[in-house]
C-alpha cells in the first residue's frame, strides 16, 4: 500500500430495476426496463460511486470475485486494482457480465481517488477540454410519429443539441420502408443544419446495409452505427469501403483486445467505447490511446454522466451519446447530473470526484438487490 494512503475498506453493491417511460426497441431488441448495478467503494472517510447498466448477475461477480482482490489495496492505486480484477475473472470469462462488473468497480475507484485528493476526476486524468460535445440519442423503432417528433424537437430546440441519432434496422432489417420514412421524418423535424445519425444495432445484412446507406444520402446521414453485427468485422469493413457515412462500432468491446480487432480489421471510421462495459475509466483511456495510434477518434456510448469526465480528458474524442434511457435514470437517481444545453456537457472543475451524489431515498423504490 502507498505510504499514508488509505486502503479500500469495502465494496458495497445495489441492484436497481427501472421501468422505461415508454416501450423501447431498436433493430434487434425490445425492452421495457433497465437494470443498474451500483458500486460504492469506501476509504479514508470518503466514498466513490460507479455503475453499469447490466444484469443483476453482475452483483455476485463484484461480491464473490472482485471485492476480495480490491479491498485492502491503496485507494490511490487504481491501476493495480484494475489489473487484479482482470486476472481474478480468468475462469469465469472476461467479457459480458464480468466486464460490466469490473467497469462499475473501476469507475467507483476513480471517483473515490479523486474525492480523497479533493479534485474532479477530469483534473485527475488531465483535462484537455472544458466542454464535451453530445448527441441526442433515442428515436426508438417503437416510437410513433408524435413521440419521435417530441423527442427530436426537445433536443434540437429546447436543449440546442446540434446532432441527433435514431434507430433503424427495425425487426432485423425487415422494415426498410419504415426505416426510411422515419429517417425522412427526423430530417424534417431537426431541419437542414443539425447532424443526423442512424443506428441499426446489427439489424441488416452486408448488402442490405450498403443499399440502405445509399438511400440515406438524400437525408444527409453522416453516421451509420453497427449496420451489421459488430462481430462481423469483414462485413463492417466491406460496408465502410462502399458508403459515405462513417461506419461505427465498439459498444460491445469488452476489452482492449476487442477494440484492437475492430481497428486492425479496418472496420470503423470512429471507435465507440463504453465506460460501463469496456473495463471502466482505466480501459476507456487505453482504448482511446489505441484508436489515436491509428488516427481514429472515439465516441462514448451511453451513460452520459459517467462519460463526461473521462471524455474531457481524451484528445481524440468526437462526442458522447446523450442516451434517453440512461440520462433519465441518472436524473432520477443522482444530484449533480450535467445539463446538455448547447450540445455540450461541462464537468464542474470545483466539485471533487465525478460530481454526483446518490439520492438513496429516491432510488430505494427501484432496488431489487
What is each model feature region?
Residues 106-142:
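Glycine-rich, aromatic-flanked loop segments that form ligand/cofactor-binding clefts
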Residues 27-32:
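Short Gly/Pro-enriched turn/cap motifs at secondary-structure boundaries
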Residues 130-243:
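Metal-dependent enolase-superfamily TIM-barrel catalytic cores that perform enediolate-based chemistry
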Residues 60, 214, 220, 231-344:
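Shared catalytic-loop signature of beta/alpha-barrel
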Amino acid at each position: 500500500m502507498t505510504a499514508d494512503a488509505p486502503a479500500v475498506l469495502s465494496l458495497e453493491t445495489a441492484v436497481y430495476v427501472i421501468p422505461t417511460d415508454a416501450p423501447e426497441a431498436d433493430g434487434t431488441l425490445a425492452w421495457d426496463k433497465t437494470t443498474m448495478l451500483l458500486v460504492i467503494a469506501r476509504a479514508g472517510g470518503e466514498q466513490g460511486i460507479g455503475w453499469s447498466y447490466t444484469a443483476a448477475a453482475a452483483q455476485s461477480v463484484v461480491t464473490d470475485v472482485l471485492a476480495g482482490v480490491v479491498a485492502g489495496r491503496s485507494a490511490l492505486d487504481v491501476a493495480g486494482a484494475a489489473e487484479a480484477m482482470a486476472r481474478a475473472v480468468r475462469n469465469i470469462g472476461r467479457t459480458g457480465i464480468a466486464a460490466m462488473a469490473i467497469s462499475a468497480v473501476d469507475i467507483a475507484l476513480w471517483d473515490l481517488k479523486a474525492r480523497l485528493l479533493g479534485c474532479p476526476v477530469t483534473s485527475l486524468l488531465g483535462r484537455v477540454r472544458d466542454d464535451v460535445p453530445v448527441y441526442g440519442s433515442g428515436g426508438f423503432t417503437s416510437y410513433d410519429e408524435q413521440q419521435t417528433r417530441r423527442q427530436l424537437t426537445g433536443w434540437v430546440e429546447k436543449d440546442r443539441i446540434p446532432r441527433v441519432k435514431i434507430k433503424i434496422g427495425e425487426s432485423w432489417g425487415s422494415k426498410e420502408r419504415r426505416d426510411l420514412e422515419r429517417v425522412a421524418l427526423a430530417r424534417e423535424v431537426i431541419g437542414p443544419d443539425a447532424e443526423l445519425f442512424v443506428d441499426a444495432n446489427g439489424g441488416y445484412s452486408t448488402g442490405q446495409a450498403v443499399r440502405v446507406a445509399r438511400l440515406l444520402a438524400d437525408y444527409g446521414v453522416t453516421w451509420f452505427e453497427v449496420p451489421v453485427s459488430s462481430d462481423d468485422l469483414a462485413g463492417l469493413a466491406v460496408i465502410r469501403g462502399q458508403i459515405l457515412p462513417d461506419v461505427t462500432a465498439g459498444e460491445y468491446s469488452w476489452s482492449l483486445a476487442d477494440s484492437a480487432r475492430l481497428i486492425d480489421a479496418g472496420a470503423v471510421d470512429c471507435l465507440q467505447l463504453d465506460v460501463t462495459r469496456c473495463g471502466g475509466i482505466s480501459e476507456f483511456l487505453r482504448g482511446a490511446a489505441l484508436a489515436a495510434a491509428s488516427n481514429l477518434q472515439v465516441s462514448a456510448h451511453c451513460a452520459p454522466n459517467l462519460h463526461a469526465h473521462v471524455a474531457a480528458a481524451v484528445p481524440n474524442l468526437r462526442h458522447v451519446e446523450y442516451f434517453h434511457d440512461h440520462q433519465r435514470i441518472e436524473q432520477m437517481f443522482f444530484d449533480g447530473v450535467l445539463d446538455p444545453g448547447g450540445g455540450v456537457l461541462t464537468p464542474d472543475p470545483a466539485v471533487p470526484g465525478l460530481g454526483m451524489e446518490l439520492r438513496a431515498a429516491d432510488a430505494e423504490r427501484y432496488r431489487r438487490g
